[in-house]
Amino acid sequence: LKNRNFDAYYCSTKDQALEQAIKLIPEGNSVSWGGSMTIKHMGLIEALYQGNYEIIDRDKGQTPQEKKELAQKAFFADTYLSSTNALSEDGQLVNIDGYGNRVAAMSFGPENVIIIVGVNKIVKSWEDGIRRARHTAAPLNVQRFPGKKTPCMTTGTCENCTSNDCICSYIVITRMCNIPKRIKVIIV
């Protein structure tokens, strides 16, 4: 990761990862995040609400339009948090996204991007990362959206669909952090 200009950290527990993530977010920052069970389960969102941050939370939108506006506003946050669908052993991030808001923010958005990655997401190559993203992550992620009617919702595996409900519209491989240390990766 460091050879690819990412800032990298390893934490052996989720509590250590939570502590490290909070250290990387300056007080007073506007902060938002992409859909991530990793971030939610480690307690990071809850910790942010207890801290001195301006929170941009698309889930607080009451209507589809409000949710969309909050997702767009997240692109301009000071700090953006996410996980990744896969991390190759040579340090490349692999992500699949439905609307593109998460991968857009990671690629060219906030000045401070923090990615939390479980060791279960580490794969040999970026090609293996795409396989993991399509055949493991996407079928699990679509379960969070009960209204989606995709083949993987039923079969549990990617069917390479072109459904209007598809959550795999964008596949992005981040091979380098163009601005050194803009993207911080915490492996837990």
Q: Positions of the model-derived regions?
A:
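N-terminal active-site beta-alpha-beta segment that forms phosphate/nucleotide-binding
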Residues: 1-71, 75-81
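Conserved phosphate- and dinucleotide-binding cores of soluble alpha/beta proteins
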Residues: 75-188
